[in-house]
């Protein structure tokens, strides 16, 4: 039995030295010193020894157990130190390396245009108002002189949620909500910007786009005031050489109504492919606020007048930056955005 114990010790020491990880070392420890380990199996045969041999074998077994436990502890410490050294090598930071360059972002062209529009109209004394994107049929249509069955409703393919609730098709409802809140106080000078929704999707239309709406209410407000305001806006947005013209049009919520064109920013009015040879580019719709809209908003149309206008932010950005396809704005292509740093 003494020879068996000595052979076990030699074999165990070899296995301990060859254990390449803490998990493997644990397996070796269980194999030799566990409750069902090799050493335990040998010691179970001590009952067959003579009384003279038992103390000798017992002493040898305890010495071997102590030697193996010490060997396990030393190997465990060595493996832990090696593992720590490996982690240190993998995780250490070379402070002499140059830092990672953080790329500089760029403002989206739509955001640039919105900010510029805000600055222009804030400089003219306007306030900025906001309203809900999910709107009632009343505010989106009826309060704007577009009752149920009105032909003008067919001009806009609306996205309804229920029979009376829809995604707003324009930002004009904000004008109604604002007038209801402040009526009959004057003057009112506001612009409202935000997302609007229609069933359109092609190179010049999107199911979601951004609109800017303007409203002025006061005494003796005239069409001349409207033209002067829009001319001032156009010159600040597109350049001092730009001119505008008003063409008769129709909108249910204004009377009279006018489409507004600017002289072509590409050919400066001489005629080109972009303006189709006319020298003019359409940018917005406008007009004098309809008396029925005043009545439904709490104002007396015999005492006040006003004008309103609306334009698409994407349309302004396309003209300002020479972008041909509106869908580019929504493709999240950093190459396009980075051009506007």
Curated annotation (Swiss-Prot):
Top EC class, one word: ligase
Signal peptide stretch: none
Predominant cellular place of this UniProt entry's protein: cytoplasm
Subcellular location: Cytoplasm
Reaction(s) catalysed (UniProt annotation): tRNA(Phe) + L-phenylalanine + ATP = L-phenylalanyl-tRNA(Phe) + AMP + diphosphate + H(+)
E.C. no: 6.1.1.20
GO CC annotations, alphabetized: cytoplasm
HAMAP family given in the database record: Phe_tRNA_synth_alpha1
Subunit structure: Tetramer of two alpha and two beta subunits.
Protein name, as recorded: Phenylalanine--tRNA ligase alpha subunit
Annotated gene: pheS
């Amino acid at each position: 039995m003494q020879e068996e114990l000595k052979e076990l010790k030699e074999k165990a020491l070899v296995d301990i030295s060859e254990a390449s990880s803490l998990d493997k070392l644990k397996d070796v420890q269980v194999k030799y010193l566990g409750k069902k380990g090799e050493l335990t199996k040998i010691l179970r045969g001590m009952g067959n020894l003579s009384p003279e041999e038992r103390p000798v074998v017992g002493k040898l077994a305890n010495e071997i157990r102590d030697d193996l436990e010490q060997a396990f502890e030393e190997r465990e410490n060595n493996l832990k130190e090696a593992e720590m050294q490996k982690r240190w090598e993998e995780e250490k930071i070379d402070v002499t390396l140059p830092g990672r360059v953080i790329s500089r972002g760029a403002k989206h062209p739509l955001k640039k245009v919105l900010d510029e529009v805000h600055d222009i109209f804030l400089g003219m004394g306007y306030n900025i108002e906001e309203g809900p994107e999910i709107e009632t049929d009343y505010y989106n249509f009826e309060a704007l002189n577009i009752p149920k069955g009105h032909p003008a409703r067919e001009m806009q393919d609306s996205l309804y949620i229920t029979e009376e609730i829809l995604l707003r098709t324009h930002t004009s409802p904000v004008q109604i909500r604002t007038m209801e809140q402040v009526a009959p106080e004057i003057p009112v000078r506001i612009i409202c910007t935000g997302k609007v929704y229609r069933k359109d999707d092609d190179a010049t239309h999107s199911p979601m786009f951004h609109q800017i709406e303007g409203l002025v209410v006061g005494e003796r407000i005239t069409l001349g005031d409207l033209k002067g305001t829009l001319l001032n806006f156009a010159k600040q947005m597109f350049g001092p050489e730009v001119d505008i013209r008003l063409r008769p049009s129709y909108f249910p919520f204004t009377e009279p109504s006018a489409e507004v064109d600017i002289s072509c920013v590409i050919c400066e009015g001489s005629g080109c492919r972009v303006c189709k040879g006319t020298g003019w580019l359409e940018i917005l719709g406008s007009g004098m606020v309809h008396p029925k809209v005043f009545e439904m908003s709490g104002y007396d149309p015999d005492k006040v007048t006003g004008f309103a206008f609306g334009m698409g932010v994407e349309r302004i950005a396309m003209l300002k930056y020479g972008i041909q396809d509106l869908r580019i704005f929504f493709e999240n292509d950093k190459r396009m955005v980075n051009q506007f740093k």
